[in-house]
A protein has these predicted regions:
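12-transmembrane solute porter fold
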Residues: 3-176, 186
Length: 186
């Protein structure tokens, strides 16, 4: 009379496996990025917590705008196209963030970071909007609860692992660059 908590047949579905991959990679990188950015801004750039928080306003605003339009974009194009577009925009934002740190260094402010963090936020919302749609694509109604629980649990686990992994990478880079945050994040 044994019934597995997770029906094994769900793990055989390509969409669920891809959703698991997205959850583990994307959400761990995302939470690690947010942790390392906050640490860099407060400890490295000497920003007060409120200044560091204000540096993410552009990210939040563009995330909201992107999330508002994402369902219409997905309906018009496709979930996969919007996922890839979100990844491209987010990568562009991260590259812009690296360039911003190279140009402004220790003189960065919420204003100098806004264009890059705005791109990151816009891409982020497109990716998150695509995540559950892809992971749940092939799920039958009877399995919806278990499948969404798999994806949600892995999302939360990845969000917890990200700061530990990327925080360790940042601290190692700081040791190699003698505590210079500008060099460590580049």
């Amino acid at each position: 009379n044994a019934h597995p908590l997770i029906p094994p047949r769900l793990l055989q579905l390509r969409s669920v496996r891809f959703g698991i991959l997205i959850a583990m990679l994307f959400f761990s990188v995302w939470s690690g990025f947010m942790f390392c950015m906050a640490l860099t801004m407060q400890t490295g750039l000497g920003m007060a917590p409120w200044q560091s928080g204000n540096s993410f306003i552009a990210l939040g605003v563009t995330y909201f705008i992107s999330a508002w339009f994402a369902p219409r974009l997905i309906a018009r194009y496709s979930t996969s196209t919007i996922l890839l577009t979100g990844l491209a925009i987010q990568i562009a934002g991260l590259l812009a963030l690296i360039a911003t740190f190279r140009v402004w260094g220790m003189e960065n402010t919420a204003l100098t970071l806004a264009p890059a963090t705005g791109l990151v936020g816009y891409g982020q919302a497109l990716i998150v909007n695509s995540f559950y749609r892809i992971g749940m694509r092939d799920i039958q109604p009877d399995d919806a609860g278990a499948a969404s629980a798999i994806l949600s649990t892995l999302q939360q686990a990845a969000l917890g692992l990200g700061p530990a992994i990327f925080g360790a990478i940042l601290l190692h880079a700081l040791q190699n660059h003698h505590g210079d945050y500008t060099q460590a994040v580049n």
